[in-house]
Regions:
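Short acidic/polar inter-strand loop motif in beta-rich domains
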Residues: 104-111
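Surface-exposed, short loops/turns at beta-strand junctions within beta-sandwich domains
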Residues: 89-95
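Beta-strand signatures of extracellular beta-sandwich domains
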Residues: 66-70
């Protein structure tokens, strides 16, 4: 069997593997840990007399375990689902900051979070 077709085939395989590795690496980079608060939107006005819902989606990454919910820096909830909603207790009127933070198994924030500022009337 001639050696030239084998070398050509080997080069094609090597390029395919290299391209696949680059695509895999790019896909892995796209899956960075994140928190996304889908509702309420930043700047929204919430009704103080209603139960308001915080809708979220999280990828905790390899260092994260679950998430905590904060209102004005005070922890108000622990969430184990990566996607869902959380009913906020009655909020007093004024400007409020709602945060979802990824924490590790020791309940320590790992720096992956999102916060939104809202107005409660």
């Amino acid at each position: 069997m001639p050696l030239l077709p084998l070398l050509s085939f080997a080069r094609t395989i090597a390029r395919t593997v290299a391209t696949g590795c680059v695509l895999f690496a790019a896909g892995a980079a796209a899956a960075e840990p994140h928190v996304r608060i889908e509702a309420p939107a930043a700047g929204a006005t919430l009704d103080a007399m209603e139960q308001n819902r915080l809708v979220y989606e999280v990828d905790p990454g390899p260092r994260g375990d679950h998430v905590h919910v904060y209102v004005d820096g005070e922890e108000v909830g622990i969430l184990r689902q990566l996607r869902g909603s959380y009913t906020l207790e009655t909020l007093s009127p004024g400007d409020r900051e709602l945060c979802v933070k990824v924490v590790n198994k020791a309940h320590t924030p790992i720096g992956v979070q999102q916060c939104v500022k809202v107005r409660v009337d």
